[in-house]
Amino acid sequence: MNASHPAVHPVGVPPAVAGQLPPRMRMKEIQGMPGTIGGLLLRLGQFCFALVAFSIMVSIENFSTVTAFCYLVAATVLQCLWSLALAIIDGYALLVKRSLRNSLLVSLLVVGDGVTATLTFAAACASAGITVLIGNDLRQCKENHCARYETATALAFLSWFMVSLSFILTFWLLATR
């Protein structure tokens, strides 16, 4: 019986073609990007902070008399809806082991994160300004709920910080495509 003997044959390196770049390597999955555990945790954190800020504001009986507080409620509702929807998408992508690197989807996420981050930051700043006005300048914290206003505003800033991280990481993903 003729048995073949294994042999190692050296393979030459293909010659480089002038003007042709080597194939691009895909960027590693950095935690916090869409479709990762970190991305899911960021979205859930955004949702929780915005939901608690919304709940605190709505629990104050006269919040609707101040426009900045109404704006904060509207911004946190939008933030809750956006973050919950993307948390569901991230969770689904993790369950079925799919990558969320479609250019159109990543572009949509960048724009959505940018818009919600801007709105949440503006609402938190406006609410912080009114809270400082009521507490420090007018000295009417006894009649108003300054501690609740401050807590809701601080939570809105935390939600903004987390959505800003999502925006930066998603923008980086889009820019390195």
Swiss-Prot record:
InterPro entries xref list: CASP_dom, CASPL-5
Q: Extracellular side: which ranges?
A: 58-68, 125-153
Glycosylation sites recorded in the entry for this protein? 62
Membrane-spanning parts: 37-57, 69-89, 104-124, 154-174
Location of this chain's protein in the cell:
Cell membrane
Matching Pfam families: CASP_dom (PF04535)
Superkingdom as given in the UniProt entry: Eukaryota
Q: Which GO terms describe its cellular component?
A: plasma membrane
Outline which residue ranges sit on the Cytoplasmic face. Answer: 1-36, 90-103, 175-177
Q: Which UniProt keywords apply?
A: Cell membrane, Glycoprotein, Membrane, Transmembrane, Transmembrane helix
Q: How does it sit in the membrane?
A: Multi-pass membrane protein
Q: Does the keyword Transcription apply?
A: no
Family according to the record: Belongs to the Casparian strip membrane proteins (CASP) family.
UniProt subunit comment: Homodimer and heterodimers.
Protein name as annotated? CASP-like protein 5A2
Name the species this protein comes from: Ginkgo biloba
